[in-house]
């Protein structure tokens, strides 16, 4: 009876693994479709770069006198961290959270020296478990977020810098390179000192004044950078989860092959044992 029981156990494992493989394969196909849609949204990047060029020219013409363009003594640092709402995405969340956590531990001696703004339930849970100061959060964003979905937290984030809640803001997210490569990225978002590094210069005539234009343009520009990073992170999330599901499917298929081989060997051994017992019984009767 033992070989039969062993065969049943192996067969049960094979069936269970096949069901798991079917689920992960279906998820992989869905995520491939989501990634394709997310990649199409990446085409906004050249437009954002052009906007940056225009904003830089306006800022340089105004001699960088706007508060959002000027560095000030840093009493408190803000960290905007983009994670996902769900797991099953390989190292997508752990890589970015590890970098943020290590950076904060290195830079700050007290929680009073920094504040965290987090997108995604995984990041929110991570920081709350460690009693780290989260001042803003947003979760349950759609897989293909629009600017309207992120506008409120982006507006509040820029507002917190403007009112002096923190004196600089860093943004952490996964930059999408390709379906198989995503890079954890740290970017200094505020103040917008990188605009001064833009060497391209075009002469404009302004109506109204440069200062009035910057009052409207710079907050909107900073908000658009947050949205651009979110789109980047979403594409990375779909790619990481798609890769994780593909690996899970491949591992399940390999396990099925191994179990099938074990099943066939066990079945052959059981048949051989039965034949041996029959022959032995026949010999005993002679």
From Swiss-Prot:
GO biological process terms, semicolon-separated: proton motive force-driven plasma membrane ATP synthesis
Membrane topology note: Peripheral membrane protein
Molecular function as annotated in GO: ATP binding; proton-transporting ATP synthase activity, rotational mechanism
Record Pfam families: ATP-synt
Keyword Cell membrane assigned: yes
Alphabetized InterPro entries for the sequence: ATP_synth_F1_ATPase_gsu (IPR035968), ATP_synth_F1_gsu (IPR000131), ATP_synth_F1_gsu_CS (IPR023632)
Subcellular localization(s) per the UniProt record: Cell membrane
Keywords annotated in UniProt: ATP synthesis, Cell membrane, CF(1), Hydrogen ion transport, Ion transport, Membrane, Transport
Principal location class: membrane
Annotated propeptide span(s): 1-4
A single GO cellular-component term on record: plasma membrane
Top-level taxon of origin: Bacteria
Family as reported in the entry's similarity comment: Belongs to the ATPase gamma chain family.
Subunit architecture: F-type ATPases have 2 components, CF(1) - the catalytic core - and CF(0) - the membrane proton channel. CF(1) has five subunits: alpha(3), beta(3), gamma(1), delta(1), epsilon(1). CF(0) has three main subunits: a, b and c.
Task performed by this protein: Produces ATP from ADP in the presence of a proton gradient across the membrane. The gamma chain is believed to be important in regulating ATPase activity and the flow of protons through the CF(0) complex.
PANTHER family: ATP SYNTHASE GAMMA CHAIN, ATP SYNTHASE SUBUNIT GAMMA, MITOCHONDRIAL
NCBIfam families, per the entry: ATPsyn_F1gamma
Protein name as annotated: ATP synthase gamma chain
Source species of the chain: Bacillus sp. (strain PS3)
